[in-house]
From Swiss-Prot:
Pathway: Cell wall biogenesis; peptidoglycan biosynthesis. Belongs to the D-alanine--D-alanine ligase family. It catalyses: 2 D-alanine + ATP = D-alanyl-D-alanine + ADP + phosphate + H(+). The keyword Ribonucleoprotein does not apply. ATP binds at residues 136-191. This is D-alanine--D-alanine ligase. Its cofactor is Mg(2+); Mn(2+).
Length: 308
């Protein structure tokens, strides 16, 4: 019989070595404080400084994983935790690895008949054959160019002119071997949290600049968020069903946040999955959860309770 959660020693994994280290430290400290305030025996563990493989030997019973980006959100730490036999929050190995790869996630959604943006894929090896003319004929202008793997909108460019396409792809290739060139989705940007099997209210993101980049996500205070997002109840219901399908198709569990854009005709298009959403004062998951009655501390405890 497992010990009650309050009697378990809980490691809060935070920091790490990805480009999103700082955000993870902020999220981790917020989660740590929330757990301690609720009477949990929680300890901060930064994999950059502490060997995670030793956690079980050190008497830990469970992990709250709030690492962001590569290493923490891509299946590697999940595999290690499976190996040493510690239950952890969030998605398992397969869903974490898959959703870190935006291209393969979209291909899977598309195969299940779920709506995504039209795209072309360029790799380092295929770059020399890139024909901007053909791409623009197929996808139009403007275009969105982004690395397939890096999180937090690093390496993104909006391409307005055909002559700028190659340099945008080269820029994105600095961050990843594989780059996506996508049709520009001109409608609203939404993000939808899922907690266990419950889809929470959508949030509308209105950045002051061209799109929601790293600075807007974590630094700027001029990005506006609306929750509820202003969709009609009928549209919100349609979005809820779409997001739940998207979540299930890629095998998410525990909690995740799914980004959705509207195209020029107002149709939903799935963008990507965040399997370890931010949990800072700026973060969107807690904002949405608050509208259905979760305090930040209750939300953190619920995510912990969903750990497997």
């Amino acid at each position: 019989m497992a010990k009650p959660l309050k009697q378990q020693k809980i490691a809060v994994l935070l920091g790490g070595t990805s480009a999103e280290r700082e955000v993870s430290l902020n999220s981790g400290n917020a989660v740590l404080t929330a757990l301690r305030n609720q009477g949990f025996d929680a300890h901060p563990i930064d994999p950059k400084e502490y060997p995670v493989a030793m956690l079980k030997e050190q008497g830990f019973d469970r992990v709250f994983n709030i690492l962001h980006g590569r290493g923490g959100e891509d299946g590697t730490i999940q595999g290690l935790l499976e190996q040493i036999g510690l239950p952890y929050t969030g998605c398992g190995v397969m869903a974490s690895a898959l959703t870190m790869d935006k291209m393969r996630t979209k291909m899977l959604w598309k195969a299940f008949g779920l709506p995504v943006a039209d795209m072309e894929v360029v790799t380092r090896t295929s770059f020399s054959q890139l024909n901007p003319q053909v791409v623009v004929e197929k996808l139009g202008l403007p275009l969105m160019v982004k690395p397939s793997l890096e999180g937090s909108s690093v390496g993104l460019t909006k391409v307005n002119a055909i002559d700028d396409l190659k340099s945008a792809v080269e820029f994105a290739l600095q961050y990843d071997e594989t780059v996506l060139i996508e049709e520009w989705l001109s409608g609203d940007e939404l993000t939808v949290p899922v907690l266990g099997n419950e889809v929470l209210p959508s949030i509308k993101i209105v950045p002051q600049g061209e799109f929601y980049d790293y600075e807007a996500k974590y630094i700027a205070d001029n990005t506006q968020y609306f929750c509820p997002s202003g969709l009609t109840e009928e549209r919100e219901q349609e979005l809820r069903q779409l997001v739940k399908q998207a979540y299930d198709v890629v095998g998410c569990r525990g909690w995740s946040r799914i980004d959705v854009m509207l195209d020029g005709e107002g149709k939903f298009r799935l963008v990507e999955v965040n399997t370890n959403p931010g949990m800072t004062s700026h973060s969107l998951f807690p904002k949405s959860a608050a509208t259905v009655g979760y305090s930040f501390e209750q939300l953190v405890v619920k995510i912990l309770e969903l750990s497997l």
